[in-house]
């Protein structure tokens, strides 16, 4: 049986992003984001209700301050009492898991979308995704960028403006571009 492009995307395989089913999911997420981002002056409780409508899993007390941007939403799982400040971006072609009690500063970008090295595959519109896992009680400073396939361990700290290109051990403090373990 042949897999659909969406099934390939969700399995982390090479897929064609121009596929009509995938494009329909992008449009649906765009409509949800338009409504969510118009709730800027609403309460955290109202935001939480909207998040449960548009994201895959939302733990109790989780907050994402608008404006917020993502590709699909259904690949995002945010734990209990996790907090994400405004202007964050999650490119969620693969699963993004944010653990309980994690705090994410403004303008953080989390990418799961990746592209093949082969220029012909890129020109054909092929891409793939690699999941990002962020543990419990992690602090990610404003403007940090988390690249595809990265796992950040529980209780880790990522400095503002850091570019995280590889896994971060539990309890580690990383900063810089590329991010490196510091003191």
From Swiss-Prot:
Signal peptide: none
Pfam families per the UniProt record, alphabetical: Hexapep, Mac
PROSITE patterns: HEXAPEP_TRANSFERASES (PS00101)
Root EC class: transferase
Molecular-function GO term, any one: acetyltransferase activity
GO CC, alphabetical: cytosol
Keyword annotations of the record: Acyltransferase, Nodulation, Plasmid, Repeat, Transferase
InterPro entries: Hexapep, Hexapep_transf_CS, Hexapeptide_acetyltransf, Mac_dom, Trimer_LpxA-like_sf
EC number: 2.3.1.-
Family of this protein: Belongs to the transferase hexapeptide repeat family.
Job of this protein: Acetyltransferase implicated in the O-acetylation of Nod factors.
Official protein name in the record: Nodulation protein L
Species annotation: Rhizobium meliloti (strain 1021) (Ensifer meliloti)
């Amino acid at each position: 049986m042949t897999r659909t492009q969406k099934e390939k995307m969700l399995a982390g395989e090479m897929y064609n992003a121009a596929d009509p089913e995938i494009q329909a999911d992008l449009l649906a997420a765009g409509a949800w984001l338009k409504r969510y981002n118009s709730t800027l002056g609403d309460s955290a409780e109202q935001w939480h209700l909207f998040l449960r409508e548009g994201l895959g899993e939302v733990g109790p007390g989780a907050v994402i301050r608008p404006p917020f941007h993502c590709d699909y939403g259904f690949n995002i799982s945010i734990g209990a009492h996790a907090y994400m400040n405004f202007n964050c971006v999650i490119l969620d072609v693969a699963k993004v898991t944010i653990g309980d009690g994690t705090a994410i500063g403004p303008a953080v970008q989390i990418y799961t979308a990746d592209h093949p090295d082969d220029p012909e595959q890129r020109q054909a519109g092929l891409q793939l995704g690699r999941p990002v896992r962020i543990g419990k009680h992690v602090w990610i400073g404003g403007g940090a960028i988390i690249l595809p396939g990265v796992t950040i361990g529980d209780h880790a700290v990522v400095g503002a403006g850091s570019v995280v290109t590889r896994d971060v051990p539990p309890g580690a403090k990383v900063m810089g571009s590329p991010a490196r373990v510091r003191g």
